[in-house]
Amino acid sequence: MSTPGQRLCGIIALMKATMAIFPRAFLVVSASLAPLLAQTPGSQQQQPEFIRQGQQLMREGKLDDALALYRRTLEASPNSLAAHIAAGSVLDLQGRGEEGRKYFARGIEVADTPEHKAMAQRAMAMSYAFERNCKKTVEYEQQVFDIYGSEKNFFQQGEIADEAARVCIESGDLDSAYHWYQLGHDTGLKEPAIKPARQDLWEFRWEHAQARIAARRGNQAEAQKHIAAAKNVFGKGTNPEQAQFLPYLQGYVAFYAGDYQAALVELLKANQNDPFIQCMIGQTYQKLGEKDKAFEYYSKASTAIAHNPAAAYAVPLARKNLTLLPS
């Protein structure tokens, strides 16, 4: 029988594995669990064996084996939140979202704290993201947003709103994306005694989002205005870790302007381990008629094992496009 500390570490380890490509998504989760871990000294050193084994199997591309492992775990421990989230995540990666959501629903039922329930609800939201279903993603992200609102945790509310917006923009629902990005910006700035660097972070993200939305709407002048504003905020030097998101932004805007050569130059400067970037590079090469390079990048994106907006966009699209490319 696992201890509460082991169960908590299992959940954290799972979220690290499934959200590794998009680090700020994991930070939201780990922050909410920190007080609980503080109540179980030494538990940080423990990690259930099924989580370690499952992570390794997924890295090796053995999703069926990982799923079987998580199901065996649930036979022995039917209330394991980590195992429910893990099993559902694997099913989403396999394109079996309807099955996966049964595990997330059960995770919501067995969650023993609001924070744990938020984790399961967030996983459910991401399940719908794999199907580009903005409406259902928002339905569950709203519940997570409200939980953090009850705690007056404005930063995490902002993170959740931005996550919902990211799903909506790539689902093609630009009005919803704008609403949630604006909500994330405005809510994040409510943080008491907010530091200038944090303010700049929210301004950078908001300009970044507005540029992408304008590009998707075909308004290049507006997109370029917001790119300039984002560069301005970044130029303050308060958030150097955001550097990788500028070439992503410029490549994204160029892609939707139809300037695929410029898009490629910028996207190749962005985070090459991000499945979203890998997929966009594949799309760009495909537009340029370079099928072999497109195949290479789609292949990379298709093997992502994260459970976040980046993978939710990349994995289904990359796999679909791989089947359409001439052999």
Model-assigned labels for residue ranges:
Residues 46-72, 76, 253:
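Alpha-helical segment of the N-proximal tetratricopeptide repeat
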Residues 48, 82, 116-119, 159, ...:
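Start-of-helix register in tetratricopeptide repeats
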Residues 59-60, 93-94, 130, 163, ...:
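Register position in tetratricopeptide repeats
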Residues 72-73, 106-110, 144, 184, ...:
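Canonical positions in the second alpha-helix
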Residues 55, 89, 126, 166, ...:
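Residue-level recognition of tetratricopeptide repeat
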Residues 86, 119-123, 156, 163, ...:
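Canonical tetratricopeptide repeat
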Residues 44, 78, 112-115, 149, ...:
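Short coil turns that delineate tetratricopeptide repeat
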